[in-house]
Amino acid sequence: MQNSLQVAQVIISALPYIQKFRNKIFVVKYGGSAQIDDTLKNDFVRDIALLQLVGCKVVVVHGGGKKINSYLDRLHIKSEFVDGLRVTDKEAMEIVEMVLSGNINKEITALLNKNGARAIGVSGKDANLLKARILNNGKYGFVGEIERVNTYVLNGLLENGLIPVVAPVATDDEANSYNINADLCASKIASALKAERVIFLTDTRGILDKDGNLISKLNEAHITALKEDGTINGGMIPKVDAALECVKNGVANAHILDGRLPHSLLLELFTDDGIGTMIKG
């Protein structure tokens, strides 16, 4: 009986958040270990299905770094990271697109549909969803930055009760393909849609200070200082830059969460304290 009462209390405590977030748009960047571990995969898709069930409009943008690394290693194709971004030559770009659009995207979409959600898998190439240009004059190879997001397509899918699952591959006006950093892709989509929240699932507890303690809230000034002293570095830089860009462009809050924690998405959104780092404008 006591356990049942506790369950009821948890549900009731989430009610204000459910009411607040109904019909709001959430963009979730899905990557890291949560994409590899079968238990975490199932937790994630059920969390997304629940968000849809309680009336949230959800867009999922996925990465695929671990699986891309695996395929590149198997094919003996070298790959390196510069400034937290994967340098992508033409040969690697073919593998990146195959893994993101053909493998991971369809797996996530199928799992969501299996668990009661209504999801549709798309690439940034579909219906000119994402138009890009080459980043930094080709410093990173076939890595692009998004210039335009086709919000008509995304809003149409959301209004019809679908969850767009977006593979971060885009083209330019000459139909050249580009690898888009998934964090920056999620940021651009969230900004274009004026989303309520954007959530980045990572393999850390959030943003940590030099002593390894979680920083629960940050603003631009704090972020600048932490980047200058090296606290924020490596692969966390594009995540933080992506989060900051969102809140500058009208997204209410950005969240960086530990995707290794079961149901971290629900804990962050539907509890008073949250469990990650929230970035505010």
Swiss-Prot record:
| Record carries keyword Cytoplasm | yes
- Per the UniProt entry, the signal peptide is none
Q: Which residues form a coiled coil?
A: none
The enzyme's main class, written as a single word, is transferase
Site annotation (Transition state stabilizer) points to K29, K239
Q: Which residues bind substrate?
A: G64, G65, R86, N179
**Highest taxon in the source lineage:** Bacteria
Give the EC number(s) listed in the UniProt record: 2.7.2.8
Chief location category: cytoplasm
Enumerate the GO terms in the molecular function aspect. acetylglutamate kinase activity; ATP binding
Q: Which reaction does it catalyse?
A: N-acetyl-L-glutamate + ATP = N-acetyl-L-glutamyl 5-phosphate + ADP
Q: Which UniProt keywords apply?
A: Amino-acid biosynthesis, Arginine biosynthesis, ATP-binding, Cytoplasm, Kinase, Nucleotide-binding, Transferase
Q: Quote a single Gene Ontology cellular component term.
A: cytoplasm
Metabolic or biological pathway: Amino-acid biosynthesis; L-arginine biosynthesis; N(2)-acetyl-L-ornithine from L-glutamate: step 2/4
The biological processes this protein is annotated with in GO are: arginine biosynthetic process via ornithine; L-arginine biosynthetic process
Q: Quote the subcellular location field of this record.
A: Cytoplasm
| Cysteines paired by S-S bonds | none
Q: What family is reported?
A: Belongs to the acetylglutamate kinase family. ArgB subfamily.
Could you tell me which PANTHER family the record lists for this protein? N-ACETYLGLUTAMATE SYNTHASE, N-ACETYLGLUTAMATE SYNTHASE, MITOCHONDRIAL
What does the protein in this record do? Catalyzes the ATP-dependent phosphorylation of N-acetyl-L-glutamate.
Task: Spell out the HAMAP family in the cross-references.
Answer: ArgB
This chain belongs to the protein called: Acetylglutamate kinase
State the organism named in the record: Campylobacter curvus (strain 525.92)
